[in-house]
């Protein structure tokens, strides 16, 4: 299991190794210095979309931020028992996720199993460059994309522009599990 409390420290180490200031990271990522400082000093995992943006700005893979060693293979098999839980029992952002391709080096896409809890603490909108796919494996959720709202059930699939504010909220008494794939351009 990946320790959430280590992610911020690892990001800070990579930033300092590259001799980048928070101001320079702000310019590279579009995230404010204040937010970046919180990410580096928090004990909770930031949203996966933020981790991807930070990895690209640092010139590393998300796997490296997660502390995993990815192989330079043309194929990667991650067995169910090998999945890495990145944020357990939900985060301050209201969800948890498991990596599905952490063994593949320099991915163009980041696949996860996303779990939305029944009663999240808070659910902010997310917004980042790129595109996402959400395929609902279990449960029902209400999904917001800009000013649009969708009810998405087991077997339904969303493909959307991630630069538009978006988020999902569990509906009903059962958590929602989704296959989530994020593509963020270089």
What do the PLM-derived regions correspond to, one by one?
Residues 9-26:
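Short basic helix-loop element that most often maps to the first helix and adjoining turn
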Residues 93-96, 153-154, 162-186:
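Ligand-binding loop in jelly-roll beta-barrel domains
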Residues 11, 22, 33-35, 48-51:
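Helix-turn-helix DNA-binding elements, focusing on the entry/boundary residues of the two helices
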Residues 15, 25, 47-58, 62-66:
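Hydrophobic micro-packing sites on short alpha-helices
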């Amino acid at each position: 299991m990946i320790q959430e409390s280590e992610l911020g420290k690892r990001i800070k180490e990579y930033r300092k190794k590259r001799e980048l200031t928070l101001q320079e990271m702000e310019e590279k990522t579009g995230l404010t210095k204040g937010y970046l400082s919180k990410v580096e000093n928090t004990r909770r995992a930031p949203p996966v979309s933020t981790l991807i943006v930070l990895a690209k700005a640092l010139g590393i893979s998300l796997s490296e931020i997660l502390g995993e060693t990815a192989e330079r293979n043309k194929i990667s098999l991650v067995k169910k028992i090998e999945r890495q839980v990145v944020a357990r029992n939900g985060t301050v952002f209201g969800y948890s996720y498991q990596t599905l391709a952490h063994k593949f080096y320099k991915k163009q896409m980041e696949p996860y199993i996303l779990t939305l809890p029944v009663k999240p603490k808070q659910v902010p909108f997310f917004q980042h460059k790129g595109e996402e796919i959400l395929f609902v494996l279990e449960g029902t959720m209400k999904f917001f994309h800009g000013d649009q709202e969708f009810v998405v059930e087991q077997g339904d699939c969303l493909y959307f522009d991630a630069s538009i504010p978006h988020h999902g909220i569990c509906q009903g008494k059962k958590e929602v599990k989704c296959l989530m794939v994020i593509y963020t351009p270089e």
